Amino acid sequence: MKAKRRVVTAAGRGTEPKRRHAGRSTSAEATPAPMAPRTSARGSATARPATARPATARPATTRSPATQLVEAVRRIEPGDVDMSVDLGRGLVLPNPILVASGTFGYGVEYGDVVEVDRLGGICCKGTTLKARIGNPTPRVTETPGGMLNSIGLQNPGVDAVIEKYADTWATWKTPVLVNVAGESVHDYVEVARRLDGVPGVAGIELNISCPNVGKGGLQFAIDAAAAAEVTAAVRRVTDLPLLVKLSPNVADIRPIARAIADAGADALTAINTLSGIAVAPGRARPLLGNIYGGLSGPAVKPVALRVVYEAAQAVRIPVVAIGGITELPDVLDFLAVGAVAVQVGTAIFADPTLPVRLVDELAEECARHGHSSYTQLVGTALPAKAGRPSVKGVEYRP
């Protein structure tokens, strides 16, 4: 039988060599201690373990800013992102995704198919002082990249709207803004007066792209003085948050935006539809019964981006964007040029659930990039000299 090899230790006693087990090792076994040579009593070279140094705690290292940023990004979840929007006078929306006037009725029509309480806000169908039957048919037609509509503000009148819908609106978490239209300053003022103080009405959006009968049919929206006049008149009769909707059918939106802001508006919405026509089959006449219609949908997005870009730099009140939003990148584009919120319009006809889905996708996008608030995405495409656009409304002081 072959004799087992013995190792002479420093104490001179023979010991059996330790066996290493495959697949199971400690740190000491994985890295053997260095052996110092020594001559034994027989003159043969043996080895002894080097003197072990006492273990000391490794000092904590300072994390680099980049590492800290990565760790912060990992900690943010979509539910942690602040999505609230302050439009002034106490109007704080739960998130920046609203639905546009004329595409969502009065909200109740979509209650069975859309989680209404998850929307940032609802701009209801245009409301006038008296009932309107609307324009002659045809009223709507599809176009490449959008649609033309000429509904003509069909609605039952402000009193009927309040009676039929306000009680329901008052039970919703989502704020409802009543879109108001008129043919004279008096019309706008009287509708606003009747809406003031009504439970369920969170604010007013003025549609000033209407012909001013007292000024020969000139639209309020295309003249700075007329736009300021109607805005100031409404401001005097209500403390409700007041948004004013801009028309893209002008050469320069900036003086009009400034005039409206100076007249007391709390926020701007942009844009209303572009004016256009379609030709009927056979080409014997225009297709729409009223000849002219409003163009909306993806085709108007570049125009809307331009108007928002200019308005956001011209005023110090929030801008809410509208025009061609069909997916999250559209929302991000409008935020980048200075919008603090967006309204989804024409796309709702194809997919009523789109606005709620955009709320989730925007929160996920913010969390993915480590943003604690969606407002970190606002104004990133504006020139540096313009400064940061307004992301908060004016505080109301009665």
Question: Can you describe what each PLM-predicted range is?
Answer:
Residues 2-44, 48, 53, 58-176, ...:
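N-terminal capping/small domains of soluble enzymes
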Residues 105-106, 186, 350:
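Acidic-and-aromatic substrate-binding clefts and catalytic sites of carbohydrate-active enzymes
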Residues 110-112, 135, 192, 281-282, ...:
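Short amphipathic alpha-helical segments
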Residues 111, 159-162, 166, 189, ...:
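Predominant activation on well-ordered alpha-helical scaffold segments within soluble catalytic domains
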Residues 128-133, 211-213, 275-278, 349-351:
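Short gly/pro/ser/thr-enriched loop/turn and capping motifs at secondary-structure boundaries
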Residues 134-145, 279-293, 348-371:
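C-terminal helical cap(s) of enzyme catalytic domains, especially alpha/beta-barrels
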Residues 171, 183-320, 326-333, 337, ...:
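Alpha/beta enzyme core
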